[in-house]
Every structure is written in C-alpha cells, then in structure tokens.
Amino acid sequence: MKTPAWKITKLLLIILICFSILGCGIEEMKIDEEDMVGNVSIIDIYDNIEFDPRFKVDFGFGCVIKLGRETILFDSGSDSKVLLENLKLAGIKPKEINIVVLSHEHQDHTGGILGFLEKNPSIKIYVPESFSPYLKNEIASKGAEIIEVSKPIKITKGVYSTGQLGSLVKEQSLVINSKKGLIIVTGCAHPGITNIVKKAKELFKKEPYLVIGGFHHPPISVVEEFRKLNVKKVAPSHCSGSEIMEAFERTYQKDFIKSGVGKIIKI
C-alpha cells in the first residue's frame, strides 16, 4: 500500500525539526571576542608549594580571581580550615566571593568547598556535568546554586569555562579574556595542558598571555609546545612537578612566574 504524500511530508517536517533542536544543542557557544576585562588579580590561596611563609601549605590547589566587581574562587583545596585561614590572611572575606568554579572532582580541589559554603551558602557554583550526584547533592544541601557545565559557557564578563574536557578525568578550566591576551587557569590539567591551551585559542582566536595552575607532570617537550602556541608567561604550581617548572624557568626566564601559596599576580 502506497503511503500518502501528506504523511511523508509530515514525517520529513518532524525529522527536520528534530535535527534543528539537536543542532542547537550541539553547536558550540558563540564567543564575543570584544567581551574582555581590564585589570585582573590572581591570588594563589591554596597550594602545596610555598611562596609566602605566612600562608599554610597543604596539598591541593585553589586561587581567588579578582575582576573589579566580581571575585571568583577557582577550586577549594583539600581542607576548608586551611582555605578559610588562608583567605583570612589574604584579607578576603568568604562573602566577598560571589562565584565558585570547581575544575574536577578530586579531593585536593573540592575538599574545602563544604566548609566554605557554611560561611557563604548563597552562591553560584559551576561544576563539570560529570560530578557525582553525591557531591552535587552535598553542595546543594548547603544552599548553593549549582550550574552544571558540559560545553564552553560564559560565567561572567570576560570569563569563560572551556567546558569539561578529557575522558578518564573530566575537567574544566577557566579562560579570562584580558586586554593583554588570554589568561588560562587550570586545576590539574588532566586532559593535557597543551590540549587546554589549544581549546582556549580555538574558542577565542586569540593568543595566550598567561597559563597558571597545575600542569599535571607533563613531559619536558611541553615547554617547546608552549612556545609554538605563543604562550607569553607561565606560572605552573601544585601538581606540575619540579622538573617541568625548572625547564619552564630556564626557557621563559623573566616570563616565568614563580608561584605558590600566597603569590599575587596582577595583570
């Protein structure tokens, strides 16, 4: 029996609508290249590498990013007591922070968040979509608003998430579109530090000014890869490893920034 033409037309319309909806879902966000920030201040607030002896050293990573009206906590270290103590030493009250971004679900990056939320519960927290239901429920139970991230998204003026990258450990990094170039902030760089930098360049079509955070013990060849990617300055810390930090320092010289807990970088 021959199918009526109107039924075929209706079916084709349904298929086209479905593709249109799915296409919107998978299309990467359009980024306004003119959406940028001026002065940026990054404070290494939690690290297993010492810089300022007044601050407590503990395994993990966290930094505070000041952007005029916005103050972002990127990762929270392993222990809330250490995090809160270091924030106090830096003269930062928990309630001054209005956005939290967690890079990935490892204890040395998320361990301080629940204690922090006791001091500042009504806050937006951006987490990779892959976070466990348990941790998401724990965070939500404190009163925070959770935003789950899968693809690149805008967080605030001039600040974006790369979206969750990687396979075994899914992780997001921050990209700050500054007037001097891209500032890329990584937690542990499980997806590969060069992959993260390439993703940022792909999103913005702009050169990286500074890459800061944990580089996850990459091979020495990464130093040359950074040069090819036109990375201007580097500030590796946390899980980067002494060998790669020494290699970066030899190659980058004045553009190598020695980082560690208590370090303040102003751009």
Q: What is the predicted function of each stretch?
A:
Residues 42-89, 171-186:
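Conserved beta-strand hairpin/beta-sheet module of binuclear metal-dependent hydrolase folds
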Residues 90, 121, 141-142, 229-230, ...:
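Short, structured coil segments at secondary-structure junctions
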Residues 112, 182, 188-267:
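Cap/insert and terminal regions of metallo-dependent hydrolase folds
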Residues 73-77, 97-105, 126-129, 184-188, ...:
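Active-site neighborhood of phospho(di)ester-bond hydrolases with catalytic His/Asp-centered motifs
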Residues 40-43, 72, 98-99, 123-124, ...:
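Structural motif
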Residues 127-172, 178-179, 257-267:
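Metallo-beta-lactamase
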Residues 5-11, 16-68, 151-165:
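Zn-dependent metallo-beta-lactamase
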Residues 81-126, 201-211, 227:
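Active-site metal-binding motif and surrounding structural segment of the metallo-beta-lactamase
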